[in-house]
Amino acid sequence: MKRLLLCLLLLVSASGARAESMVVIVRHAEKTSGESDDPPLSDAGRARAETLSRMLRDSEISAIFTTEFKRTKETAAPTAIALKITPTVVRATEIATLADKLRELHGNALVVAHGNTIPDLIKTLGIDVPLNIPENDYDHFLIVAVGSQPRLLRWRYP
């Protein structure tokens, strides 16, 4: 799976103009159900976060961005620990701020966000394609080549 991810990153970077950075964007993993406005990850969510970490171990991620919510921080945590990166927290409502940070970045990044904010982030990064992430869908794995000609690669992960 790691080799496939590396091939996908190379494919996106090789097509068209050279990208300044590759941004992996995922929705937070499965959360617990309940009445909390800020629920933690469920057991399935923690397992998915570990899978994400294994997938990104050799991807040369140099920055990680999460929102202020537990579920995004917990999804990013295994990757952050494995890569020894302190995640940057950006408020979920500050899509333009996050997009600016990603455009300024010279390296690969992981963004863990929310199903209702990812479509706006993709659009703000220059990708104008319809994207809908249903409430019960946690397996979208998006790679955006950020540069003069932004490109999007959609994938699903276990």
Residue ranges and their predicted role:
Residues 4-13:
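Sec-dependent N-terminal signal peptides
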Residues 13-14, 39:
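Single-residue recognition of alpha-helix boundary sites
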Residues 15-19:
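Sec/Tat signal peptide C-region and signal peptidase I cleavage site
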Residues 20-106, 118-132, 136-158:
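Active-site-proximal alpha-helix that buttresses catalytic centers in soluble enzyme cores
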Residues 108-110:
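Short SAM/SAH-binding signature in class I
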Residues 112-114:
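Short beta-strand segments
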